[in-house]
A protein has these predicted regions:
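Non-catalytic accessory segments flanking enzyme active sites
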Residues: 1-50
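Extended aliphatic helical segments
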Residues: 6-8, 20, 52, 56-58, ...
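Generic beta-strand structural signal
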Residues: 27, 42, 56-58, 101-104
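Short secondary-structure capping/junction motifs at helix and strand boundaries
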Residues: 39-41, 53-54, 71, 108
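Short beta-strand element of the alpha/beta-hydrolase
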Residues: 43-47, 54-65
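Cap/lid segment of the alpha/beta-hydrolase catalytic domain
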Residues: 61-151
Length: 151
């Protein structure tokens, strides 16, 4: 990935202190990446335990079907690139168990960094670095896996 500086801004969209039956604070944060006159947005979903009053370790993991799939919580903002049903991956995301153990959980839909489809390359984070199409990538440039790692 290029060493170019990318401007990053954050906008808190949600800060609910009674999520997960009152045991967690749910935050939803829109992250905006800007460079070369181009912007890309990612939506971070985070749960933090309410019973721990100090900083906590947080599991950070991409999700593959959209933020709304990790829980049946009706207030999770759906991912922009996913129409998957709310909660359909909840069995793979032990949110309550993680919170009860005193950890946090943060997730972002991987499509927010690189939609996993060649015809949507221009929508990826790589466009910020002057690579609007797959044909514009230098020989040592990254593609999907590099974009996900960068994210």
């Amino acid at each position: 990935m290029p060493a170019d500086k990318v401007d990053v801004s954050y906008k808190k969209l949600d800060d609910n202190h009674s999520a997960v039956n009152g045991s967690a604070t749910r935050k939803q944060i829109e992250i905006t990446f800007s460079h070369n006159g181009i912007e890309r947005k990612a939506l971070l979903l985070m749960y933090l335990p309410n019973h721990v009053k100090t900083k906590v370790p947080v599991f950070l993991h991409f999700n593959f079907q959209g933020n709304q799939t990790v829980s049946s919580d009706p207030d999770i903002i759906p991912s922009q690139y996913s129409d998957r049903p709310r909660g359909n991956q909840a069995s793979r995301w032990p949110v309550e168990k993680i919170i009860d153990a005193g950890y946090g959980l943060a997730t972002i839909h991987y499509f927010d960094f690189f939609p996993d489809s060649k015809d949507r390359y221009a929508e990826s984070i790589l466009a910020l670095f002057g690579h609007p199409s797959e044909g514009d990538i230098p020989a040592d440039g990254g593609q999907a896996i590099a974009a996900w790692a960068w994210g």
